[in-house]
From Swiss-Prot:
EC identifiers of the protein: 3.6.4.-
Keyword vocabulary terms for this entry: ATP-binding, Cytoplasm, Cytoskeleton, Hydrolase, Nucleotide-binding
SUPFAM superfamilies (UniProt xref): Actin-like ATPase domain
Entries under Pfam families matching the protein: Actin
Protein name per its UniProtKB record: Actin
Note from the entry: There are at least 7 different actin genes in tobacco.
Source species: Nicotiana tabacum (Common tobacco)
């Protein structure tokens, strides 16, 4: 073990939509694949194909015609542990090609993750994968670290869930964390619906992937939604064309900004919830009056659903309208924010000061899964 290369910690960020995994110290994850487990619908159908009982990630995606697909993480929280174990197994052995018993593992968790879940993660790492050490960190806190700060409020919006997490000197303030069950998957659904209204048919899972691509490539957030709607009626400046895999070209105009507008107006999809701007404001208001100034001045965006062009300006405009007029508002949208949770994990796990923070196997053997609450907070 003298060779430092051997004991490089592993960092695994398990999202609702994508798993991001790699080695501490790297500046980007080596493996990014869908959080899906597929099981054959009919056993014995693929005779002689060396059929596996389960497929994970891209392979499950490409064979989906003969599989039943499951997402083991719902709204950011693990709901199916057998499938989750399959995903971790695939991550270590097939994607990173490492032996987990030789590396400390840093895992990420959603804010307000139930205690039993943290214990279960800890147990699986030590008992199934025999890791020498592990740690569980809150996703939004890692995003803040990645932006080079320890105090601020993070709006983390991925595929399955969004959270606003106020953090003071490195610690998340649980009483002020707010969760919004509105994220990338809902935006894709909404865009499918708008395009269907226009006469295009997108219904299957394969077509859903196409719409997700349209969303990622062409959507943007309007600074002023009403005005943008007016502009789109009279001018073709917002129109863009997109070539479908079959060669058909579709034109999308107002849909480009109507789709992500849902983040600011959840009522557009019939949700009774505050938009991301108001949720961020509400989160700040749940914090002690003395630290609000620090939070308003450091609003950090993180996650794939914050990648829309125009989002930072719009957030800034909306929060300025809600906050006290003398307050200085700063919204930070780091270019690498799609992976900033993973990057924060990579930074944290490679700090020399962090080395005494790991839960060692010996400590686990002595105290059991509840050790995670004492060491990871």
């Amino acid at each position: 073990m003298a060779d430092g290369e051997d004991i490089q910690p592993l960092v695994c960020d398990n999202g609702t939509g994508m798993v991001k995994a790699g080695f501490a110290g790297d500046d980007a994850p080596r493996a990014v694949f869908p959080s899906i487990v597929g099981r054959p619908r009919h056993t014995g159908v693929m005779v002689g194909m060396g059929q596996k009982d389960a497929y994970v990630g891209d392979e499950a995606q490409s064979k989906r015609g003969i599989l039943t697909l499951k997402y083991p993480i719902e709204h950011g929280i693990v709901s199916n542990w057998d499938d989750m174990e399959k995903i971790w197994h695939h991550t270590f052995y097939n994607e990173l090609r490492v032996a987990p018993e030789e590396h400390p593992v840093l895992l990420t968790e959603a804010p307000l993750n139930p205690k039993a879940n943290r214990e279960k993660m800890t147990q699986i790492m030590f008992e199934t994968f025999n890791t020498p050490a592990m740690y569980v960190a809150i996703q939004a806190v890692l995003s803040l670290y990645a932006s080079g700060r320890t105090t601020g409020i993070v709006l983390d919006s991925g595929d399955g869930v969004s959270h606003t997490v106020p953090i003071y000197e490195g610690y998340a303030l649980p009483h002020a964390i707010l969760r919004l069950d509105l994220a990338g998957r809902d935006l894709t659904d909404h865009l499918m619906k708008i395009l269907t209204e226009r006469g295009y048919s997108f219904t299957t899972t394969a077509e859903r992937e196409i719409v997700r691509d349209v969303k990622e490539k062409l959507s943007y957030i309007a600074l002023d939604f009403e005005q943008e709607m007016e502009t789109s009626k009279t001018s073709s400046s917002v129109e863009k064309s997109y070539e479908l895999p079959d060669g058909q070209v579709i034109t999308i105009g107002a849909e480009r900004f109507r789709c992500p507008e849902v983040l600011f107006q959840p009522s557009m999809i019939g949700m009774e919830a505050a938009g991301i701007h108001e949720t961020t404001y509400n989160s700040i208001m749940k914090c002690d009056v003395d630290i609000r100034k620090d939070l308003y001045g450091k609003i950090v965006l993180s996650g794939g659903s914050t990648m829309f062009p125009g989002i930072a300006d719009r957030m800034s405009k909306e929060i300025t309208a809600l906050a006290p007029s003398s307050m200085k508002i700063k919204v930070v949208a780091p270019p690498e924010r799609k992976y900033s949770v993973w990057i924060g994990g990579s930074i944290l796990a490679s700090l020399s000061t962090f080395q005494q923070m790991w839960i060692a196997k010996a400590e686990y053997d002595e105290s059991g899964p509840s050790i995670v609450h004492r060491k990871c907070f």
